[in-house]
Design a protein with these regions (language model features):
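Short secondary-structure junctions
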Residues: 10-18, 71-73, 253
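ATP-binding pocket architecture of kinase catalytic cores
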Residues: 20-142
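Active-site Asp-x-Gly
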Residues: 55, 188-190, 196-257
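Short acidic/polar mixed-charge low-complexity motifs
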Residues: 15, 39-43, 207
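An alpha-helical support segment within catalytic cores of ATP-dependent transferases
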Residues: 1-17, 92, 107-114, 118-119, ...
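Short helix-adjacent coil turns
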Residues: 276-282
Length: 295
């Protein structure tokens, strides 16, 4: 799709964009663009790479409409959501960190030691996890009951093992995790599902101001939404986040900390499942490496 094509589609929806656009080609499903309208406002564009993404776009649109009613932080305001183009005004501030997929360089856009980050993230998590399951049902979104969480992971482990392979050490750890009853919660809540510092926007002072990339949001084990934090900020910061989350009214159980560590350790499995789903060779190679499999 050319810049002129994008301008024409945007104009059909009443958005007049300049021809000066920049693009990030890394996405599998969407090409991401950055553009400016005639009033100087900056927009983020998502251009579908395939014709079969309409259902996925509608699902994420429903998620965004649901969460913006409940969160005090910004989420993308999709002003155009068509099978050909998604567009929304850029959020204020920047992600806590950005990651260059080519050079692997990490850039922090906030003070990593900010005392504001953990309390403000905890507040957003409490708001998110408090969304009523009835509202989730009404929006037709995925719901996993407590007794459905482990079987889904076990099925994915079997799929990844058969399609990509997995080293004995990781498989043993994951099966031990799945068999450890005391780690698993007896409740599930609405979660983001892919939350880490790259999807969390903050002020320079480290106050959380927005969250992006909501396509995986569903009802499941809340340790999902803590695991991305420990991978970036470490175990002591995870303990602080759980403490703050509980203090602000979040629902926890005795082994949330231990469960989160195991969830974080299962990142290669999650990546492997993503690679199998997308059948993208770059991700398949990357997943095999993380899973300890020789290419």
């Amino acid at each position: 799709m050319t810049i002129k094509d994008i301008q024409e589609i945007a104009e059909e929806h009443g958005l007049l964009l300049s021809g000066d656009m920049k693009f990030n080609e890394m996405g599998i499903d969407f090409k991401v663009g950055f553009a400016t309208d005639q009033d100087g406002k900056q927009w983020l564009l998502r251009i579908p790479r395939r014709n079969d993404l309409g259902e996925q776009i509608e699902k994420e649109k429903c998620i965004l409409q649901l969460v913006k009613k409940h969160l005090s932080v910004q989420v993308p305001d999709w002003q155009i959501a068509s099978p050909k183009l998604v567009a929304y005004p850029l959020l204020e501030d920047k992600p806590a960190l950005t990651f260059d997929a080519i050079t692997y360089e990490v850039t922090w856009n906030m003070n990593q030691e900010s005392p504001n980050y953990v309390p403000s993230l905890a507040k957003a998590l409490v708001e998110l996890h408090s969304i009523d399951e009835k509202d989730v049902v009404e929006n037709g979104l995925k719901i996993l009951k407590p007794n459905e969480v482990r079987p889904e992971i076990a099925d994915r482990l079997q799929l990844v093992k058969s399609e990509l392979g997995i080293c004995t050490e990781l498989e043993t750890r994951y099966r031990k995790w799945l068999d450890n009853d005391k780690l698993w919660p007896d409740f599930t809540l609405f979660i983001h599902g892919d939350l880490y510092a790259g999807h969390v926007f903050t002020s320079e002072e480290g106050v959380v101001s927005g969250i992006i990339d909501w396509s995986t949001a569903h009802v499941s084990d809340i340790s999902h939404d803590f695991s991305g934090h420990v991978n970036v900020f470490g175990e002591e910061s995870l303990k602080a986040l759980i403490t703050e989350y509980e203090k602000q009214g979040g629902k926890v159980w005795d082994n949330l900390y231990e469960q989160t560590l195991e969830r974080a350790a299962a990142a290669p499995l999650a990546y492997g499942f993503f690679a199998v789903e997308t059948q993208d060779e770059t991700h398949i190679r990357g997943a095999k490496s993380q899973l300890g499999v020789e290419s």
